[in-house]
Amino acid sequence: MGNLKEILEGGWSLVEGMRVTFRRLLRPVVTVQYPREVVTLSPAFRGHIELKSFADTGTHKCIACGTCERMCPSNVIKVQGTKAQPKGAKVATHYVIDFTRCSLCGICVESCPTGTLQYSTEYELAGESRWDGVIDLMQRFEARRPQSL
């Protein structure tokens, strides 16, 4: 009688397990087969930092004030700029950020007085070496910018 009870309990356990398996099998797939499928991003996604292009000027408005550099808790931002005209405002010439150490806290975006920093929607930043994460945002901005005729 003891063996029959064990067989029935084992059979019931098998039926219960198959019920759970089939129930999960009929649900829609949640896993995204990245990189074969494109990942749908949330509107609240905060990627890495990039320079924003303004429609009125067609360029960024970074004045190389260094506020973002001073406010960065990770100390990964280096900004350099020059004055285009003797009595004019400074214009950023280099905006280098080390994304391998950046915590993406967003303090630089919030503290920018001209609002020229924004979060990117790009999420594929893999590289072959550590130095691939050190990026000059000015070069990336110029590469993204449409060339005028």
Curated annotation (Swiss-Prot):
Annotated positions binding [4Fe-4S] cluster 1: C62, C65, C68, C112
Binding site for [4Fe-4S] cluster 2: C72, C102, C105, C108
SUPFAM superfamilies: 4Fe-4S ferredoxins
GO molecular function: 4 iron, 4 sulfur cluster binding; iron ion binding; NADH:ubiquinone reductase (non-electrogenic) activity; quinone binding
Swiss-Prot/TrEMBL catalytic activity: a quinone + NADH + 5 H(+)(in) = a quinol + NAD(+) + 4 H(+)(out)
Gene3D superfamilies, A to Z: 3.30.70.3270
Cofactor note: Binds 2 [4Fe-4S] clusters per subunit.
Coiled coil residues, start to end: none
GO CC terms of this entry: plasma membrane
Function: NDH-1 shuttles electrons from NADH, via FMN and iron-sulfur (Fe-S) centers, to quinones in the respiratory chain. The immediate electron acceptor for the enzyme in this species is believed to be ubiquinone. Couples the redox reaction to proton translocation (for every two electrons transferred, four hydrogen ions are translocated across the cytoplasmic membrane), and thus conserves the redox energy in a proton gradient.
Family membership: Belongs to the complex I 23 kDa subunit family.
Protein name per Swiss-Prot or TrEMBL: NADH-quinone oxidoreductase subunit I 1
